Amino acid sequence: MGTLTVTGRARSMGALFAGVALLNTATVGLSTAATLIVAAGSGPGWSGLPSVANVLGTAAGAFGAGLLLPGHGRRRVLVAGYGVAAAGALVAFAGALTTSLVPLLLGILLVGLGNGGAQLSRYLAADLYPEERRGRALSNVVWAGTVGALAGPALMAPAADVVTGFGWPSLSGPVAVAVLATAGAALAAAFLPRHVPLPPEKPAATVAPARAAGVARPLVAMVAAQLTMVAVMTMTPVQLESHGHGLDVVGWVLSAHLFGMFALAPLSGRIADRWGPRVTVNAGLGVLALSTATALAAPTAHTSGLPVALFLLGYGWNLVFVGGSAQLSRDLAPETRSRVQGTVDAVVWSASALAGLGSGQLFAGGGYALVAVVGGVLALLPLALLASRDGR
């Protein structure tokens, strides 16, 4: 891979960080508004469709970006991906104006395709640095999610006020923000240096992720963490609402979760660089198990137990996500790296769809306690499997 100057590296990191922050801002606001639009127009039973569209789009986008990066370079791929996201946001905006389900979901799917490129940005950041600094580099890009987690919800009410002044539906406001944010992400990606060659890949190479060296461990752990995190997170608002708590309590608990997911990512990166990706992943799985035990012990303690549980849920996921990503950046051969990374992200995001659908069934069958128990088992299972494998 080509060598970057300090200025070129800083420019690349700034562009990658800005693109991820803006895409996350767009996704948070768009998904929230779309969920409310669908629930109001088609009933609560269909309100999960925007989330499914976003997850499927992101999985496909990550896979496609991983295939395209070796031959076309990071700048072209990210600009194109974010451009598709901007076009999708425009389509979704048209759907929001007319409360039409088809363009709304199609737009979210296209935004998800662009988000797939944003997900791979952490690996691109890691490639800019020597091995001993890759954990911190990719964690800084993961931290960009904090911007979206804060800015997306914060901009919803002001955006609604602006669009109602034009006589448009209030929920089209966050979608309008998504249009601007995705366009900004494409502009940010255009500032990436032109000549930052990626490790070459063999065009005919096909890699089975579970068999590639260094992939099985992070893949299993990242899928388990995603299943646990999404299942418990998705059902927590339902649990709170069923016990009479309002949106203010839901927002407080989810804020603790989002803080854990993103804000401490640089700390996770330092842990990965200091003690290694494997230790980081194992610690994350342990924290996830602790979070589910806390949720099980205090399922209605909205001022103490649940915020702590959801914070631990977010940070446990972050440790696994950063540690697993660092291991993929370190252990994969250059000729297969981006392709396998894209495939792994596609599998992980597909797990999100499974967790989102399955958690509702678990909650209906056994309540929040069953969701927490299954989440804890999912978190501990990789530790047991990988320990058994290491012992052989």
Where are the language model's segments positioned?
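Helix-loop boundary and gating motifs at the non-cytosolic
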Residues: 6-59, 216-221, 225, 229-251
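Hydrophobic core of transmembrane alpha-helices in multi-pass small-molecule transporters
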Residues: 21, 101-116, 305-319
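Intracellular juxtamembrane helix-capping segments at the cytosolic ends
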Residues: 34, 116-130, 319-332
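Helix-to-loop junctions at the C-terminal end of transmembrane segments
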Residues: 61-74, 160, 263-277, 363
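C-terminal ends and interior cores of transmembrane alpha-helices
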Residues: 83-98, 287-300
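C-terminal membrane-cytosol helix-exit motif in multi-pass small-molecule transporters
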Residues: 156-157, 161, 179-201, 385-389
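C-terminal transmembrane helical hairpin of 12-TM major facilitator-type secondary transporters
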Residues: 278-324
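A late C-terminal transmembrane helix in Major Facilitator Superfamily
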Residues: 335-366
